[in-house]
């Protein structure tokens, strides 16, 4: 999903054949939507059928199936402090993935049935093979190829988090599982939203020719302001300029480290720096990239077990559009040193600022996700 976009026949054509397309149809693929390849005039792909936050599922696995508010969202599994091996980690993660993918499928299939009953799309069906021959609309499975494609993100963050545990707890043994868990539970000694904005001073002005920027006029913020409060101030300014009476507020409550001593904060921050300095996905390091691959394949293999009401297969995708930013707010601190509520990695790209060996190394890491 980068700029410029790159599409590779040597990867796409075999992938489509693996999905049941004939070789001729696979060779005739085109890119629709954002980046999705499909055979034109023969496919009802329903791409972007859902967004699936892999990092949130791993977050839930860390807490034994519970959300940050203590509510049991998934199956009861061993929480992170009870993981005695990588097998324990993967058992908890895979169990939660299985559960939440099943809920994704239930929701998508319900929508699919609603599409069939409420929006049969007869005109579009007349243009898609073989709806007329089968006597079915595309919503009933009239197309030759039928898919449902949910999109995942947070798989790179999850892979990096898994590698940090593997390296520091089970290999180097310089940190314990409990140490990492306690530091995460206190957001590494920082208040919620820390790490999102740490510049000394920012002034948004009308120098830009963009209309939205001009409408902002100027909003001054200090280094003590969180990103949420900065965004809130800017949006409120724009709304006021446009005469809108719409109000907007962003919850900027601090939920972390309210009971930390200075010594605890320093210790949690020390742990975060160790985790953050750990080798990361995107630098063509096999042992790191294989953790991201495993995290991704657990999700994708589970998705591909299911069929949709049109008789087609579920197929997993991995890109977020921009949901990695918004949905990062639902994910607590992770074992890779990421602060609570911070944005997640952009699709299968490395985490922001953690690819240090150039674009070819990043490309090599991405290529390992599905070998």
Language model: regions and residue ranges:
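Conserved catalytic cores of very large enzyme subunits
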Residues: 1-222, 229-231, 240-371
């Amino acid at each position: 999903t980068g700029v410029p976009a790159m599409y590779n026949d040597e990867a796409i054509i075999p992938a489509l054949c693996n999905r049941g397309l004939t070789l001729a149809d696979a060779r005739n693929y085109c890119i629709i939507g954002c980046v999705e390849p499909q055979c034109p005039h023969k496919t009802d792909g329903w791409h972007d059928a859902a967004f699936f936050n892999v990092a949130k599922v791993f977050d839930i696995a860390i807490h034994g199936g519970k959300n940050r508010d203590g509510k049991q969202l998934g199956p009861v599994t061993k929480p992170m402090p009870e993981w005695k091996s990588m097998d324990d980690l993967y058992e908890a993660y895979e169990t939660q993935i299985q559960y939440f993918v099943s809920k994704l499928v239930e929701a998508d299939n319900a929508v699919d049935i609603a599409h069939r009953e409420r929006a049969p799309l007869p005109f579009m069906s007349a243009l898609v093979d073989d709806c007329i021959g089968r006597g079915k609309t595309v919503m009933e499975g009239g197309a030759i190829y039928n898919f449902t494609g949910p999109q995942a993100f947070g798989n790179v963050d999850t892979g990096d988090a898994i590698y940090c545990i593997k390296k520091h707890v089970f290999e180097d043994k310089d940190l314990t599982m409990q140490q990492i868990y306690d530091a995460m539970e206190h957001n590494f000694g920082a208040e919620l939203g820390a790490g999102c904005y740490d510049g000394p001073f920012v002034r948004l002005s009308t120098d830009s020719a963009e209309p939205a920027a001009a409408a902002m006029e100027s909003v001054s913020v200090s280094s003590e302001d969180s990103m949420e409060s900065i965004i809130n101030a800017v949006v409120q300014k724009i709304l006021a300029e446009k005469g809108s009476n719409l109000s907007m507020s962003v919850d900027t409550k601090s939920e972390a480290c309210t009971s930390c001593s200075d010594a605890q904060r320093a210790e949690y921050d020390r742990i975060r720096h160790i985790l953050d300095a750990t080798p990361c996905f995107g630098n063509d390091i096999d042992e790191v990239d294989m953790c991201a691959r495993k995290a991704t394949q657990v999700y994708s293999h589970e998705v591909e077990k299911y069929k949709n009401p049109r008789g087609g297969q579920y197929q997993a995708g991995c890109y977020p559009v921009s949901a990695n930013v918004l949905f990062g707010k639902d994910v607590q601190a992770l074992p890779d040193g990421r602060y609570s509520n911070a944005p997640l990695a952009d699709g299968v790209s490395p985490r922001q600022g953690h690819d240090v060996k150039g674009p070819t190394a990043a490309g090599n890491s991405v290529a390992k996700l599905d070998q």
